[in-house]
Amino acid sequence: MKSYMAKTNEVERKWFIVDAEGKTLGRLSSEIAKILTGKNKPEYTPHVDTGDFVIVVNAEKVVLTGKKLDQESYTYHTGHPGGLKQISFRRMLAEKPELLTYHAVKGMIPKTRLGRQMLKKLKVYAGENHDHEAQQPQALEL
């Protein structure tokens, strides 16, 4: 029996909506990464994007355990001399809560062209409202 290899034009993508309220950031992000990569499907193929679209709402109400709010931070460089910047999780959660969830999922996706394509299917919103009612997303309980 031959192994099945999915083709790009045969993949059927669904839309899922996830409520992040009260969920732990890392556990939520790993489940979202599985859906984006398509590893939850039986027709998963490593070189084809078989994943589904994921909408995350209430990103501002995500939970971090322990002292991570104060101790952990994201580091980035502006590209200019002396441009190394750090932003703590507490500040990021207060200013741009959707970026905290986005970066957590981004770290769990492959760092390739295919990974960047998978990450485009992630839509994160700080509050309850989102712009994707026309896609009729299915509620997903993680």
Swiss-Prot record:
GO MF term list: mRNA binding; structural constituent of ribosome
The keyword Translocase is annotated on this UniProt entry: no
Entries under Pfam families matching the protein: Ribosomal_L13
Keyword Cell division: no
Disulfide bonds: none
Taxonomic superkingdom: Bacteria
Cellular component per GO, a single term: cytosolic large ribosomal subunit
Record-linked PROSITE patterns: RIBOSOMAL_L13 (PS00783)
InterPro entries from the UniProt entry: Ribosomal_uL13, Ribosomal_uL13_bac-type, Ribosomal_uL13_CS, Ribosomal_uL13_sf
SUPFAM superfamilies the record matches: Ribosomal protein L13
Keywords recorded for this protein, A-Z: Ribonucleoprotein, Ribosomal protein
Gene Ontology process terms (BP): negative regulation of translation; translation
Protein role: This protein is one of the early assembly proteins of the 50S ribosomal subunit, although it is not seen to bind rRNA by itself. It is important during the early stages of 50S assembly.
Subunit structure: Part of the 50S ribosomal subunit.
The family this protein is said to belong to: Belongs to the universal ribosomal protein uL13 family.
Protein name: Large ribosomal subunit protein uL13
